[in-house]
C-alpha cells in the first residue's frame, strides 16, 4: 500500500476519534526521517508501506495517522501511527542574554541546527537545544555554560539549512 496523505493525528480530538478502538500498528522513525516525503516504512508488526506525500506536505509528526482500515466483515481493523524515536540532545540554558549570544554565535559557526524554546515551552525554561555532539559538550563545559544531556522526542526535526559563504 502507498500512503499519499496524512489522515490526522492521534494527539488531536478528530484524529483520536478516527482511530477509535482500532488496533494500532506503529512506524518508529528517527527525527531525520520526518522530513522525507518519499520512503519505505515498516510497522512494528512487520507490515511494509510506501510513503509518497505531495511536494509541499508538512513534515511528519509523532502521532500522525497513515492508514485506518476495517476488515472484510466491517469490523474495525488497524490504524498505522507514526511514533518518533527520542533524540540525544543537549539542552543549553544560558544564564544571560550575553552568554546565550556567545553560545549561539559559536555553535552557529559550526552550522549546527538548533531549536529555541522559551520558559513556557516543553523544557520549562529558556533553552537552546542541539543534537548531542561530544565536541559541543566539551565546548560548553570549557566555558562553564549550564547544559544538560537528555533523550527527547522533538516535535520538530532538526534540519540542516543550505548556505554559502
Curated annotation (Swiss-Prot):
Matching Gene3D superfamilies: Urease metallochaperone UreE, N-terminal domain, UreE, C-terminal domain
Keywords: Chaperone, Cytoplasm, Nickel
Disulfide-bond pairs as recorded: none
Subcellular location field: Cytoplasm
GO CC field: cytoplasm
Family listed: Belongs to the UreE family.
Name of the protein this chain belongs to: Urease accessory protein UreE
Species whose genome carries this gene: Micrococcus luteus (strain ATCC 4698 / DSM 20030 / JCM 1464 / CCM 169 / CCUG 5858 / IAM 1056 / NBRC 3333 / NCIMB 9278 / NCTC 2665 / VKM Ac-2230)
Amino acid at each position: 500500500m502507498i500512503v499519499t496523505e496524512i489522515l490526522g493525528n492521534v494527539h488531536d480530538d478528530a484524529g483520536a476519534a478516527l482511530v477509535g478502538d482500532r488496533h494500532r500498528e506503529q512506524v518508529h522513525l528517527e527525527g531525520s526521517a520526518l522530513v522525507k516525503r518519499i520512503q519505505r516504512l515498516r510497522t512494528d508488526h512487520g507490515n511494509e508501506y510506501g510513503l509518497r506525500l505531495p511536494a509541499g506536505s508538512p513534515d511528519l509528526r509523532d502521532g500522525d495517522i497513515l492508514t485506518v482500515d476495517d476488515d472484510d466483515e466491517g469490523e474495525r481493523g488497524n490504524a498505522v501511527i507514526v511514533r518518533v524515536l527520542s533524540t540525544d540532545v543537549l539542552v543549553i540554558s544560558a544564564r544571560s542574554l550575553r552568554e546565550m549570544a556567545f553560545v549561539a554565535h559559536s555553535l552557529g559557526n559550526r552550522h549546527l541546527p538548533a531549536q529555541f524554546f522559551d520558559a513556557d515551552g516543553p523544557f520549562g525554561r529558556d533553552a537552546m537545544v542541539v543534537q548531542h555532539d561530544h565536541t559541543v559538550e566539551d565546548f560548553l563545559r570549557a566555558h562553564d555554560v549550564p547544559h544538560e544531556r537528555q533523550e527527547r522526542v522533538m516535535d520538530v526535526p532538526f534540519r540542516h539549512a543550505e548556505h554559502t559563504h
